[in-house]
Amino acid sequence: MTNLLWQKPGVAVDAKIQSFLAGDDVILDREFFLYDIAASKAHAQGLQHIGILSLQELGGLSEQLDLLAADFRSGAFVLDAQYEDCHSAIEARLTERLGDAGRKIHTGRSRNDQILVATRLWLKDKLQRVATLSAEIAEVALERAQAEAELPVPGYTHIQRAVVSSAGMWWAGWAEAFIDNAVRAGDTVHLVDSNPLGTAAGYGVNLPLDRAHTTAELGFARLLVSPIYAQLSRGKYELAALEALGSATLDLRRIAWDLSLFTSGEFAFVALPAQYTTGSSIMPNKRNPDVIELMRATHASVAAARTEIEQLLSLPSGYHRDLQSSKGAIVHGFGRGLAALELLPALLANLEWRPDKLRAAIDSGMYATDVAVEAAVAGVPFREAYKAAAQASETAGQGRTPEGSLAARVSPGAAADLQLDVLQARWQALRA
C-alpha cells in the first residue's frame, strides 16, 4: 500500500497493522468515489474563492477530477489496494498530474469531513431510490386494488380463517403501507440533507472557507453548522437512513410471507410467473419460490446493519476510527434492501390469483361476524349476538355469498368503501 497521506518522515509502517487499519475500506469506497470527486471539485472552488488556489490551478484540478471520474466509470482507473482509501487515491492522482496544485487540494479539509460529505450525498441518492421504489410499489397495488376490488379472498388472523375479505382490501393495505414508506424515505432525505464539508476534523479551521458555496454547489438544502455536531451526526444519519429503508423492507418481508403462504400447495391462492421460481437439484417436481423467500430474508440484513451502527455509536464526541465500520453497514444494508425492492413492482404486477381456490377456502364460519353485527344492528346487545353467532357458526353462511358479505362491509376503508380515491390523492402528493 502506498500514498499514505498521514505518514511521517522516518516512521516505518508495519504492513500487517496497516492492512488491519485499512480493512476493506478501499473496496467499500468504490461506492463513494464519485461523490468524493464531486465534493473535491466544490472544495477546490471554495479554496479559489479565498485565494488558496489560482484560477489556473482550479481549472486544472476541475479538469483532472472530471477525467478521474470518467476513468473510474469506464474502468480505466481502478480503486484498489495500492491506495488506503478513496481520499488518498484522489489526492495521489491530482498530485501526479498537477504537482503542487494537487498537494493544495486538502487545504482546510480533513478526511473526516471528506467522508462525511461523500456518504451524505450517497445516502441522499439511496433514500430517494427507496422513496421512488416505494411509490412504484404503491402504484401497482392501487391499480390492482381498483381492478380486483370485488374479488373475494379469505381473510386471516393468526393464520386461521377469519372473515370474508377481498383482493381489493389486500392490495389497498400494501398501497397505503408503501405510500407511508415513500413519505418516510423522503422525510429522511430532508434530515440528512445538510452539508458537513468545511468542518474539517471536527473543530473547524483557521480559514474563511466558503461553506455557503459548497452547500449550494453540492445541492444541499442547508449547512450543517457545528463542526462538533458534524462528527456526532456520523452514524446518527446512517441509522435514520437504515430505519427508513427498514420500514420498506419490513413491509417487503410481510408481503413476501403472504405470498410464500399463498403460493404453497396448501393454499394455492396465487400463481407466480416462472421467472420468480427455481427448481430443486434433486426433486424434479419442485418449483421453489426462492425470489420471495430471499426478499423475506432481506430485512434481516437491513436490521443487522442498523444494529451494527447503533453499537458503534457507544462513543464520546469527536471522531473515532470505530466509525469507519459504518461504511460497510450502509453499503451492505442498502445493497441488499434496494436489490429486493427493485424486483417487487414487476412481481406484484404479474402475480395471478386463482379465484376458484380463493372461493373454496371461504367457509360458513367466516360469516359469523356478519351475523353478530347484523343482530346488534337489530337491537340485540352485541355480546349476546356474539355468543349466539358463535354457537351457530357452522350454519352462519346459509343463504350468504362472499359478494354479499363484501357489499355489506361499508365502514370506511373496508371492502365496500376502499377509499381508493383518498389513497390515490396521497400517492399523487408523492409526485408533487
Swiss-Prot record:
Describe the reaction catalysed, as an equation: 2-(N(omega)-L-arginino)succinate = fumarate + L-arginine
Assigned protein family: Belongs to the lyase 1 family. Argininosuccinate lyase subfamily.
The pathway where this protein functions is: Amino-acid biosynthesis; L-arginine biosynthesis; L-arginine from L-ornithine and carbamoyl phosphate: step 3/3
Major subcellular site:
cytoplasm
Name any one Pfam family assigned in the record. Lyase_1
- Would you tell me the protein name for this molecule? Argininosuccinate lyase
Naming one, the record's GO cellular component terms include:
cytosol
The residue stretches assigned to a coiled coil in this entry are: none
GO annotation terms (biological process): arginine biosynthetic process via ornithine; L-arginine biosynthetic process
Q: Report if keyword Hydrolase is assigned.
A: no
**UniProt-annotated location(s):** Cytoplasm
Name the Enzyme Commission number(s) assigned to this protein.
4.3.2.1
Alphabetized Gene3D superfamilies for the sequence: Fumarase/aspartase (C-terminal domain), Fumarase/aspartase (Central domain), Fumarase/aspartase (N-terminal domain)
* Top EC class of this enzyme: lyase
User: By its UniProt entry, which HAMAP family does this protein fall under?
Assistant: Arg_succ_lyase
